[in-house]
Amino acid sequence: MADHYEARTSSQGALNVDRRTSISNENFFDIEEEDFLDMYPLSARQRLIYQCKRSSRKLLNTFMDLPLWKRAAVLLLCGGATVSALVMMVFHKSILERMIKISNELRSWWYTPFIFFLLIFFVSFPPLIGFSMLCTSAGLVYGVSFKGWLIISLGTVLGSIAAFSVFKTVFRSYAERLIRLNDKFEALASILQDHNSYWIIALLRLCPFPYSLTNGAIAGVYGISIRNFSIAQVLTTPKLFMYLFIGSRLKNLGESSSTATKLFDILSILFAIIALTATASILYYKTKERYLELQRRNQDRFDTLNF
C-alpha cells in the first residue's frame, strides 16, 4: 500500500515538474518575445540588430517547416522577383515610357472604367491576388482624381460585399478554414466577436492581411452582419487615394526630364508607402497584443483547471 502511494506520489510529482517545466519554458519564450528589450539597457543600434536577428530566425524556421513543394515555390517566386527588379533597374526608362503610352491609350477608351471595376471586383474573392497592383494602375491612368477613386471604390466596396456574402452563406466552412490559416486571423476573429461594430471592422481592414483572404475570413466570424461590413468598407475607401497617388507619381516619374522633379516623385512614393506601412503596422501590433492576451488568458484557464 505504501509502495503504491509512493509510486502514485512520485508520478504526480513528475507530472507537476513536467507541467512546471513546460510552463516555465513557455514563460521564458514569452519574456524573450515581449520583455527582452526592456530587461537589458540596449542602444538603439543593438535593439535594431536584435530585432533583425530574431525576425530572420523566425523567417528561416517558418521556411524550413514548409513542405518541399512550398519551399520550391517560395524560392521560385523570390527568384522571379529578383529578376524583375534587375530588369526594372536596367530598362526602367523604356519600361516607364511603355507604361505611360499604355496608360494614355487606356484613358482614351470609354470602356476602361468597366475593365478596372470588373478586375477589382473579382480579385475581392479569395484566393485571388492583385488588388494593390490594379489600384496603382488606376492611378497611372486617371491620376489622383475623383473618377479614379470612384472606379476603384465601387469595385472594392461591391466586390468585398459580394465576397463576404458568398462566403458567409455558401462557403462558410471554407471561410472558417481561412481563419485557422493564421494565428493573427484567429485574433482578428476574436476581436470582431468581442466588438461587432463597423468601426472595428474598418480598422481591421487596414491591417496588413491579404485583401481577398480577409474578405473570406471575416465572413467566417459569427455575428458579423452584412450591414456593418458594408459600412466598414465605405469608411475605408479614402485610403484608396494613396494608391492613386503612387500611380500618378510613377507616371510623372516617366514623363519628367528634370532631376529635381524625379527626386521629388521618388520621395513622394516612398513617403506614401511608409505611411501605408506605418498605419498597417500599428494596427497589426494592436491585433498581436490582443492575440497574446488571449493566449495568456487560455494559459491561465488551463493552469486553473489543472490545479
From Swiss-Prot:
Localization: Golgi apparatus membrane
Residues on the membrane's Lumenal side span: 1-71, 135-143, 249-262
One cellular component GO annotation, for this chain's record? Golgi membrane
List all topological domains (Cytoplasmic).
93-113, 165-227, 284-307
Bilayer-crossing residues are 72-92, 114-134, 144-164, 228-248, 263-283
This protein's record includes keyword Transmembrane? yes
| Start and end residues of each stretch annotated as VTT domain | 139-250
Chief place where the protein resides: Golgi
Family annotation (InterPro entries): Golgi_membrane_TVP38/TMEM64 (IPR051076), VTT_dom (IPR032816)
Q: How does it sit in the membrane?
A: Multi-pass membrane protein
Q: Name one GO biological process term.
A: vesicle-mediated transport
Q: Which UniProt keywords apply?
A: Golgi apparatus, Membrane, Transmembrane, Transmembrane helix
For this chain, the family text in UniProt reads: Belongs to the TVP38/TMEM64 family.
How are the domains described in the entry?
The VTT domain was previously called the SNARE-assoc domain. As there is no evidence that this domain associates with SNARE proteins, it was renamed as VMP1, TMEM41, and TVP38 (VTT) domain.
The function of this protein is:
Golgi membrane protein involved in vesicular trafficking and spindle migration.
Q: What is the name of the protein in this document?
A: Golgi apparatus membrane protein TVP38
Instruction: Tell me the organism.
Output: Eremothecium gossypii (strain ATCC 10895 / CBS 109.51 / FGSC 9923 / NRRL Y-1056) (Yeast)
Lineage summary = Eukaryota, Fungi, Dikarya, Ascomycota, Saccharomycotina
Instruction: State which gene encodes it.
Output: TVP38
